[in-house]
Amino acid sequence: MSEPVNKVKQTQQQVDDVTNTMHIAVGKMLDNQQKVSELTDKSENMKQGAQQFKKKTNEIKRLMWCRNIKLTLIIIAVVVLLLVVIIVPIVLKFT
Amino acid sequence: MSYVPLKQPLLEDDGSFDYEETLLSERNEQAKHLAQDIYHLKGAMDDLKMMVDEQGEMLVQADNNVTTADLEIEYGVEELEKAYVYKSRSKKRIIILVVVILLILAVVIGASIKFFVKK
C-alpha cells in the first residue's frame, strides 16, 4: 500500500524539480531577451554605419575620379597649347 | 450467540474502510495537485518555447545585419583603395602639368628673347 504513495510523491518531487528548473530557465531567457534585443539594436546601428561608410567612400572615390579627369583634361589642353606655341613659329618661318 | 459474531465483523470492516477512504482521499488530492503542477509546467514550457523562437528570430536578424555590415565595409574599403589610387594619379598628373607649363614658359621666353635680339 505504501509503494503507490511513494510513487506519487516521487513523481510530485520530480515535477517540482522540473518546475524549478523551468523557472530558472525562464529567468535566464528573460535576461537573454534583453541582451538579444540590445544586440539586435547594436547590429542594426552597425549596419547603418556600414551603409553610411559605403556611401561616403563611394563619394570620395567619385570626387577623386572627377579630380583625376579634370587634371587629365587640363594636361591635354596645356599640351595642345605647348604644341601650338612650338609649331606656329616654325610655320611662320616657312611662310 | 448469532448476534455477537455479526457485531464484531461490522466494527472491523468500518475501521478498515475508514483507513482506506482516508488513504484514497489523500492520494486523490495528491494526484490532483500533481496534475495541476504538470499543467503549470506545460504553461512554463510553452512560454519558454515562445521566447526561444522570438530570440532565435532576433539572433538571425542580428546575424544578417552583421553579415551585411561586413560586406558593405569590405566594399567601402575597396572604394577607399580606388580613391587612393585616383589621388596618386592626380598627384602624378599635377607634376606632369607643372612640367608642361614650365616647358611652355621656356618656349615663350625663348621666342621673346629671339624677338628682342632681332630688334
Swiss-Prot record, chain A:
Recite the UniProt keywords alphabetically: Coiled coil, Cytoplasmic vesicle, Membrane, Transmembrane, Transmembrane helix
Whether Coiled coil counts among this entry's keywords is: yes
Cross-referenced Gene3D superfamilies, in alphabetical order?
A: 1.20.5.110
GO process terms (BP): hypotonic response; vesicle fusion
Query: Under what name is this protein listed?
Result: Synaptobrevin-A
One CC-aspect GO term: plasma membrane
A single Gene Ontology MF term assigned here is: SNAP receptor activity
Residues folding into a coiled coil are: none
The record places domain v-SNARE coiled-coil homology at 7-67
Q: Where are the transmembrane segments?
A: 71-91
- Cell compartment(s), UniProt: Cytoplasmic vesicle, Secretory vesicle membrane
Q: Which organism is it from?
A: Dictyostelium discoideum (Social amoeba)
Q: Can you tell me which family this protein belongs to?
A: Belongs to the synaptobrevin family.
Which stretches are Cytoplasmic in the membrane topology?
A: 1-70
